[in-house]
Amino acid sequence: MLNVKFGFHINISGGLAKSLENAKSLECKTIQIFSRNPRGWNYPELKKDEVENFKIKLNELKISPVVVHMPYLPNPASPDKEIYKKSVESLVTEIKRAEILNAEYVNIHIGKKMDDTLENALKKVVEAVNYAIEKTINSKVIILLENTAGQGSEIGFKFEHIKFIIDLIENKKRIGVTLDTAHLFAAGYDLRDKKSIKKTFDEFDKIVGMKYLFCIHYNDSNSEFNSKVDRHWHIGNGFIGDEGMKLLITYKKLSHLPFIMETPKKSPEDDPNNLKKVKEYLENKFWE
């Protein structure tokens, strides 16, 4: 089997240590978690004993890297002053929590411009990220900008948007990118065959730079190509399809990256079925 770091977004509702039991049963080599309930603004303190157990278990299971995903409510592109302020503070807090958990990355959605202009919205994200890095000056946690599907007023669905932000980040050692395959596809970057995959990642390399790519959110899409609709789907069963999903995880250019699945979890069989599919794909050879 090819040596690719794959894993899932793991639910922590049963506690941090329990989440790693789930990760182990799914053979995860890397994981993504929320550090708290993602549907609110409140931050319950991380319990010291739970954190210690989590870190010990991480070491035991050799799970790395760990990605902490920002909650759903923050919008670092928001024109609303109150929401923007809370979003920036959330980012700072999330970086501090990631550090406590020995997580390497904090993944953020670039956000929605609402009724603002694209340029204003992108500049807001730049300010938010620069502020958060400044406020966590001694941290090594890297902020990952995740591309979007371009749904509604979302920004960040074009590589040029991501480049605009990174160009204006003062400490470039603390910034990177997550590319979500479902979002790429919905935003008009084709991934269904070798030629399309090469074209998409060559374009990313030319505009943003592969050195900034730290993570792949490995999801099939339940919405059609260039639909600007964000709908994750089970691996190989969506519009990207079996061939595209297989080619993505066996593409040599991406083989050093963590592939994290954020596929639907409607039944207990969903994750194991997606795991099975990934393991089948990894029986193939890398291609270049």
Predicted regions and their residues:
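N-terminal pre-domain/capping segments
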Residues: M1-M70, P74-K96, N284-E288
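Acidic/histidine-rich catalytic cores of soluble enzymes
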Residues: Y131-W233
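Conserved active-site loop/cleft motifs that coordinate metal ions or position small ligands
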Residues: Q32, F214-H217, H256-T263
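Conserved, mostly hydrophobic/aromatic
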Residues: A23, H69, S87, A98, ...
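Active-site acidic/histidine proton-transfer and metal-coordination neighborhood
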Residues: E60, P76-G176
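Acidic (Asp/Glu)-rich catalytic clusters
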Residues: E21-C28, K47-V67, E94-N102, I133-S139, ...
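Active-site beta-loop-alpha junctions enriched in small/polar residues
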Residues: H9-S13, R36-P38, P71-L73, G111-K113, ...
